[in-house]
């Protein structure tokens, strides 16, 4: 193998949002994750809602009041 072309492979800590800390090896000094085996509903057996709002709901909440081109918000269609 060639020298000085590979990244530095070192011991790293993985920190979860629930407070669990794991140690492994990686090229990064530390890694932060949002969910792990200690708090994931599949592994704990507890049913809890992990995602508070999906991407579609966030979009609808943010841009739901905007009318798009070609749509009329309060205008009635004229009948002949």
Swiss-Prot record:
The record's free-text note on cofactor binding: Binds 1 zinc ion per subunit.
UniProt keyword annotation of Metal-binding present: yes
Gene3D superfamilies the record matches: Ribosomal protein L31
Database matches in InterPro entries: Ribosomal_bL28/bL31-like_sf (IPR034704), Ribosomal_bL31 (IPR002150), Ribosomal_bL31_A (IPR027491), Ribosomal_bL31_sf (IPR042105)
Pfam families per the UniProt record, alphabetical: Ribosomal_L31
GO BP, sorted A to Z: translation
Keywords: Metal-binding, Ribonucleoprotein, Ribosomal protein, RNA-binding, rRNA-binding, Zinc
A GO-annotated cellular component: ribonucleoprotein complex
Record-listed Zn(2+) binding positions: 16, 18, 36, 39
Domain of life: Bacteria
Molecular function terms, GO-annotated: metal ion binding; rRNA binding; structural constituent of ribosome
Keyword Cell membrane: no
Record note on quaternary structure: Part of the 50S ribosomal subunit.
Function: Binds the 23S rRNA.
Family: Belongs to the bacterial ribosomal protein bL31 family. Type A subfamily.
Protein name: Large ribosomal subunit protein bL31
Organism: Methylacidiphilum infernorum (isolate V4)
Organism taxonomic ancestry: Bacteria, Pseudomonadati, Verrucomicrobiota, Methylacidiphilae, Methylacidiphilales
Gene that encodes the chain: rpmE
């Amino acid at each position: 193998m060639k020298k000085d072309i590979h990244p530095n492979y070192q011991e790293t800590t993985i920190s979860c949002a629930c407070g669990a800390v794991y140690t492994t090896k990686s090229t990064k000094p530390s890694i932060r994750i949002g969910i792990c085996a200690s708090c994931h509903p599949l592994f704990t057996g507890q049913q809890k809602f992990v995602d508070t709002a999906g991407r579609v709901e966030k979009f609808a909440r943010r841009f739901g009041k905007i009318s798009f081109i070609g749509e009329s918000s309060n205008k009635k269609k004229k009948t002949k």
